[in-house]
C-alpha cells in the first residue's frame, strides 16, 4: 500500500508543477484534494500496522489464547460482576425435586409455545413510534387502533391463505379448491410481477372490516406503505397488495 501511494505521488509531482505554472489559483483549488490524499495515506498506514500486528499476535493457533487474552485483543470489556462461577451455583437435587421438575417442564413448554404461535404475524401490528412517523395529512382522522384493526384483518387473510397454500391435494376441501382457483386467476392477471403468492386485493379485505372502517381502507393504504407494512403492484385495473 505504501509503495502504491508513493508511486502515485511521484507520478503526479510533475503534473502538479505544470499546473501551478499554467492555472491561476491552483494552490487553493488543489489543497483540499492533497489533504484528502494525506488522510487516505494515514488510514492505509494504520491499516497496514494493524494487519502486521494481527499477523504477529496470531501466528499461533487460537487454542493457545485464553478467554481474557482474546477479549483484550478484540477490545471487549467484561465486567467482573458478570463473571459467575457456575459450578458453585450447582446444587444437587433430590429424586423427588428432579421428578417435579421433569413433570413441570412439558407444561411450561406448552404454555410458552402458545404465545409464540400467536406472535407469528405476516403483517405485524403498528407500534407507537411507527405511527408517529406517518404524516398528518395522510392519517386524517385515522387512529392507531383503527390502523391496527385494518392490519389485523390483512394478517388474518394472509394467514388463512398461507394455511390453504400449505395443504396437500388430499387435505383441500371443495371451498379451498374454489378459493385456490380464484387466486390462480389473479396470479395470471398479475403477469408474474408479484414476488410472492401471499397477496390480496381490496375486495378480499373490505368484507372483513366493520362498517365504520370500510371507508377508511383507502386512506390506510398510503399510511401502511409509508411505514413499509405493505407494498402494492398495479396490473391493469387491479391493485395487488403484499407484505
Curated annotation (Swiss-Prot):
This protein's source sits in the domain of life called Eukaryota
Task: State the InterPro entries in the record.
Answer: SKA1 (IPR009829), SKA1_MBD_sf (IPR042031)
Keyword Transmembrane helix part of the UniProt annotation:
no
Indicate yes or no for the key word Ribonucleoprotein: no
Q: Which UniProt keywords apply?
A: Cell cycle, Cell division, Centromere, Chromosome, Cytoplasm, Cytoskeleton, Kinetochore, Microtubule, Mitosis
Q: What are the Polar residues biased-composition ranges? A: 95-112
Extract one GO molecular function annotation from the record: microtubule binding
Q: Where in the cell is it found?
A: Cytoplasm, Cytoskeleton, Spindle; Chromosome, Centromere, Kinetochore
Q: Where does it mainly reside?
A: cytoplasm
Its GO biological process annotations read: attachment of mitotic spindle microtubules to kinetochore; cell division; chromosome segregation; mitotic cell cycle; mitotic metaphase chromosome alignment; regulation of attachment of spindle microtubules to kinetochore; regulation of microtubule polymerization or depolymerization
Q: Which GO terms describe its cellular component?
A: cytoplasm; kinetochore; meiotic spindle; microtubule; mitotic spindle; outer kinetochore; spindle microtubule
UniProt-listed Pfam families:
SKA1
Annotated region Disordered: where?
95-116
Q: Using the UniProt annotation, give all residue ranges assigned to the region (Microtubule binding).
A: 119-243
The entry describes its oligomerization and partners as: Component of the SKA complex, composed of two copies of ska-1 and a single copy of ska-3. The core complex associates with microtubules and may form dimeric assemblies. Interacts with ska-3 and microtubules.
Per the entry, what this protein does is: Component of the SKA complex, a microtubule plus end-binding complex of the outer kinetochore that stabilizes spindle microtubule-kinetochore attachments, promotes alignment of chromosomes at the mitotic spindle equator (chromosome congression) and assists suppression of the spindle assembly checkpoint. Kinetochores, consisting of a centromere-associated inner segment and a microtubule-contacting outer segment, play a crucial role in chromosome segregation by mediating the physical connection between centromeric DNA and spindle microtubules.
Which family does this protein fall into? Belongs to the SKA1 family.
From the Swiss-Prot or TrEMBL record, give the protein name. Answer: SKA complex subunit 1
Q: What is the lineage of its organism?
A: Eukaryota, Metazoa, Ecdysozoa, Nematoda, Chromadorea
